[in-house]
């Protein structure tokens, strides 16, 4: 394998987005697909997605709430992935897969509006897990909707308010602590000066069209992998979810890094 393509998307309802997800996967052919906010039990996932050609699929969901998926392209890795749930999983929010020394996680962090303390505990447990994976000698790619805008510039100026959940200082502090456990924010590292690198938009007042949004969706990677990242793209024009897909490419041969942020049209 000369490159590894990993994609993440909060679909905000897998049944509503079936055709869009199928078309997107067929076009992009990621080696790893991470999905969040399925709002579906495993039995409710559309059959065409359960039988995704060329992929080993794992679904983890509940009726009308939360849920994650993780799908590994069959010819991307020599060995069968081992799917599992890290100990901090609750409300069907986390699934992981291990292939040799690589661990990939698809996670949907709680919003925190109903139980902010539970969100903070989830993040603390996530920090501990990242440390444990790296202590084991494995490499980690942690993907998903983390429900935190990491810094001020990850929120459009019209939306900035440090009192709002998702922008609170204590959340951002925990985010940085997670990164200090050996992860790199791939999108921001490849595009450090982009003030419009948003992945979520409120579904009203043409916010997406005007790109007045927040950056909530991330690909975080172990330092050794992040050093080989050649692309991290936000596909703002794709789909009708309130989130956009994010796609990262890691060059196994260590090619020079560049970034692509796709705009509508």
Regions found by a protein language model. Give the residues of each.
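Surface polyanion/phosphate-binding segment centered on an Asp-His-Pro turn
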Residues: 233-265
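Active-site beta-strand termini and strand-to-loop segments that position acidic
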Residues: 73-74, 97-100, 222-223, 241, ...
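Surface-exposed cleft-lining segments at the edges of enzyme active sites
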Residues: 84-85, 108-123, 159-164
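Conserved beta strand-loop-helix elements of the APE1-like EEP
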Residues: 64-79, 204-227
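Structured beta-strand-rich core segments of catalytic domains in phosphoester-bond hydrolases
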Residues: 38-41, 45-110
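Metal-dependent phosphoesterases centered on the DNase I-like endonuclease/exonuclease/phosphatase
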Residues: 53-54, 124-212, 216, 262-263
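N-terminal, active-site-proximal structural segment of metallo-dependent hydrolase catalytic domains
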Residues: 1-52, 56, 63-68, 256-265
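Active-site beta-strand/loop signature of hydrolases that rely on acidic residues for catalysis
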Residues: 6-10, 25-43, 104, 130-152, ...
């Amino acid at each position: 394998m000369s490159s590894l393509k990993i994609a993440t998307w909060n679909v905000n309802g897998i049944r509503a987005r079936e055709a869009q997800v199928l078309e997107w996967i067929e076009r992009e052919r990621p080696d790893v697909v991470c999905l969040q906010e399925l709002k579906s039990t495993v039995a409710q996932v559309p059959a065409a997605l359960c039988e995704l050609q060329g992929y080993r699929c794992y679904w983890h969901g509940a009726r009308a709430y939360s849920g994650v998926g993780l799908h590994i392209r069959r010819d991307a890795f020599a060995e069968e992935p081992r799917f599992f749930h890290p100990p901090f999983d609750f409300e069907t929010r986390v699934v992981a897969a291990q292939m040799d020394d690589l661990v990939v996680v698809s996670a949907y962090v709680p919003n925190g509006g109903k139980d902010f303390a539970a969100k903070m505990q989830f993040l603390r447990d996530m920090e501990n897990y990242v440390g444990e994976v790296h202590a084991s000698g494995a490499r980690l790619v942690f993907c998903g909707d983390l429900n935190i805008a990491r810094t001020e510039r990850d929120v459009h100026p019209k939306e900035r308010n440090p009192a709002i959940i998702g922008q609170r200082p204590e959340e951002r502090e925990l985010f940085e602590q997670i990164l200090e456990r050996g992860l790199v924010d791939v999108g921001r590292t490849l595009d450090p000066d982009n003030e419009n690198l948003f992945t979520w938009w409120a579904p009203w007042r043409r916010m997406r069209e005007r790109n007045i949004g927040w950056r909530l969706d991330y690909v975080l990677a172990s330092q050794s992998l992040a050093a080989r990242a050649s692309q991290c793209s936000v596909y703002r024009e794709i789909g009708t979810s309130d989130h956009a897909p994010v796609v990262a490419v890691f060059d196994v041969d260590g090619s020079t890094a560049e970034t692509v942020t796709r705009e509508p049209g």
